[in-house]
Design a protein with these regions (language model features):
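ABC-fold ATPase nucleotide-binding domain signature/coupling loops
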Residues: 49
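N-terminal metal-binding scaffold of metallo-dependent hydrolase/deaminase domains
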Residues: 1-41
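Short loop/helix-cap segments at secondary-structure boundaries that form the rim of catalytic
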Residues: 36-44, 127-132
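Residue-level signal for inorganic ion chemistry
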Residues: 9, 60, 112
Length: 139
């Protein structure tokens, strides 16, 4: 079995305290095999000057509205916000909306988001959800 070891100044495990000069061992499929404090041989260890932490979760998303980023007037209250969504929802062609959904999936994953809960009112995000490396749930 091929093993990959990466290390950083700190490793933040899912449970437990941060580990100074910690490491994470992975198998060839990316499954975590072991986490611990780095001691001894480090020649085959990939070191990163920073921290390693579990993937982040976006627990409330409306990915289908990605095309509306930076389009809302501020300080309109909840009813004003909802009115803007209703007015702008179909303001871009479907192909553009789907491309922007994929762009936002790629951006979130690149920034460390590995799981997402999406509140969806249409099927425009379904193809991107099938292709993403992120774990997704749709409500």
């Amino acid at each position: 079995m091929t093993k990959r070891r990466i290390s950083a100044n700190y490793v933040f495990p899912v449970t437990g305290e941060p580990i100074k000069n910690g490491y994470v061992d992975f198998d060839e499929n990316g499954k975590i095999l072991e986490i611990g404090a780095l001691e001894g041989e480090t020649e085959s260890t990939e070191f990163y000057n920073g921290i390693l932490c579990p993937g982040f979760t976006n627990a409330h998303c409306h990915i289908e509205l990605s095309h509306l980023k930076d389009k809302f007037q501020e300080k309109t209250g909840m009813s004003g916000f909802i009115n803007q969504i209703n007015a702008l929802r179909d303001s871009a062609p479907k192909e553009e909306r789907i491309a922007l959904i994929q762009e936002q999936f790629d951006r979130m994953y690149a920034e460390g988001v590995t799981a997402m809960a999406d509140i969806s009112n249409c099927d425009e995000s379904f193809d991107a959800k099938c292709r993403t490396k992120m774990y997704t749930r749709t409500f």
